[in-house]
Each structure stands twice: as structure tokens, then as C-alpha cells.
């Protein structure tokens, strides 16, 4: 069984290398000038990756806060009901409307930031809705008896959540969080609608300048390799967490 798994990994890696090699040979934009390569690299590393990291940071922090507030109950039932309705509606609005539409609305509403930071905020607010649902399901997957036992020993609710429930929930939801990061990475391709020059928008400009589809095809390869890398890192983190159990 172990030998079969090793063979599968070798074949999978070989296939990936073969696909990328053939794709690069046919799609590599050899005609690009050094300055154009510099701009292209900046549109990927600074814009696309920058938007992804910024949006993911906002999304994870805000999403976890929303999930935490959803579970934290007060003695006032009316306050609890209003709080839950607000969080639920926020999640429904963000999940029920297109990312492009949210981006366009924020670009009109928020005028104190440039479009790059508006894109970061829009991506983060959208991601937070999905992270909240993911974290909520992760917390609900933990046996309720653990919280009850912690509370019975006199541990405050917040401490019990931070030290007992959340560490276990994070292990359960890590694959879903990695998938959300990958989804966010691909969703950055819509920021061109508010004139942010990400790698997709840049490749479209190069395609128009050179009358060639190669810049767009090459960008597709870049996305493919990036997603493979993110997935690999996510799996390694998951394995590391399991080893520490």
C-alpha cells in the first residue's frame, strides 16, 4: 500500500511537470520586452498576490470574529436575536451577490482610498462571509460536552473557546480555509473592473498590444502552478497539525 502511494505521487508529479513544460513551450510570450516582463511580474507579485494576502487576512480575522460573536450569547434574548439576524444577513448578502457587483459598489461608496485598497477591502468582506460559515461549522463539529466541562470547572466562556474549542476547530477547517484562499486568489482576476492592473488585466493588455493569445495562455499557466503550490502548502500544514496531535 505504501509502495502504491509512492508510485501515485511520482506519476502525479511527473504528469504535472509534463503538462507545465508542454504548456510553457507553446504559450511562453517570447516577444515581451524586459520592461514589460518587469510590469508583468509586478502585476502578479504585488497586485494579485498582494490582494490575495490582504483580502485573506481581513476575511479570516473578520470571519472568525463573526463566528465567535454568533456563538457568544448574552442574557438578553432580544440582543441575541438581533445580533444573529445581522450576522446572518451579512453572510447572505455577501454570498448572494456577485463579487464583481460588490467591487463596483464599494468603488463608488468608498472614495478615501485608491482602487487597490478598495479591492483588498471588497475581497476581504466577501471572504469573511465564507470564513464565518466555515468556522461556525468547525466549532459545531466539536463535542458540546467539552465546552460544558470547561464551564463546569469555572473557566470563562472566552477562555474555553480560545484554549479548548478553537484549536480543535482550526484543525478541522484548515482544508476549507486553504480552499477559500485559493478561491480568493482566483477572484482577484475581477479587479480589472475598477481599473486595478492585476496579472489577468495585464495579460489582456499584452494580448491586445501583440495581437497574440500567448500572454493570456501563459497567465493561465501561472494561475495553475500557483494553485498547485498553495494546495501543496495547505496539505503540508494539515499533515504537520496531525503529527502534533
Residue map of PLM features:
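Transmembrane alpha-helices and adjacent helix-loop boundaries
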Residues: 1-245
Amino acid at each position: 500500500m505504501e509502495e502504491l502511494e509512492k508510485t501515485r505521487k511520482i506519476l502525479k508529479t511527473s504528469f504535472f511537470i509534463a503538462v507545465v513544460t508542454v504548456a510553457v513551450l507553446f504559450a511562453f510570450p517570447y516577444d515581451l520586452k524586459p520592461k514589460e516582463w518587469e510590469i508583468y511580474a509586478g502585476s502578479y507579485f504585488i497586485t494579485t498576490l498582494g490582494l490575495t494576502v490582504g483580502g485573506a487576512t481581513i476575511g479570516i480575522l473578520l470571519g472568525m470574529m463573526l463566528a465567535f460573536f454568533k456563538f457568544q450569547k448574552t442574557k438578553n434574548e432580544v440582543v441575541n436575536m438581533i445580533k444573529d439576524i445581522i450576522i446572518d444577513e451579512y453572510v447572505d448578502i455577501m454570498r448572494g451577490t456577485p463579487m464583481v457587483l460588490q467591487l463596483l459598489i464599494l468603488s463608488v461608496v468608498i472614495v478615501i482610498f485608491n482602487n487597490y485598497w478598495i479591492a483588498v477591502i471588497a475581497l476581504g468582506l466577501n471572504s469573511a462571509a465564507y470564513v464565518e460559515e466555515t468556522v461556525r461549522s468547525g466549532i459545531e463539529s466539536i463535542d458540546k460536552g467539552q465546552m460544558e466541562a470547561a464551564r463546569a470547572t469555572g473557566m470563562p466562556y472566552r477562555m474555553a473557546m480560545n484554549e479548548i474549542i478553537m484549536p480543535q476547530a482550526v484543525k478541522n477547517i484548515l482544508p476549507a480555509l486553504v480552499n477559500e484562499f485559493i478561491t480568493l486568489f482566483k477572484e482577484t482576476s475581477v479587479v480589472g473592473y475598477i481599473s486595478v492592473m492585476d496579472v489577468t488585466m495585464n495579460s489582456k493588455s499584452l494580448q491586445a498590444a501583440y495581437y497574440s493569445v500567448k500572454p493570456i495562455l501563459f497567465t493561465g499557466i501561472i494561475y495553475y502552478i500557483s494553485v498547485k503550490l498553495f494546495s501543496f502548502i495547505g496539505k503540508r500544514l494539515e499533515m504537520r497539525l496531525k503529527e502534533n496531535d
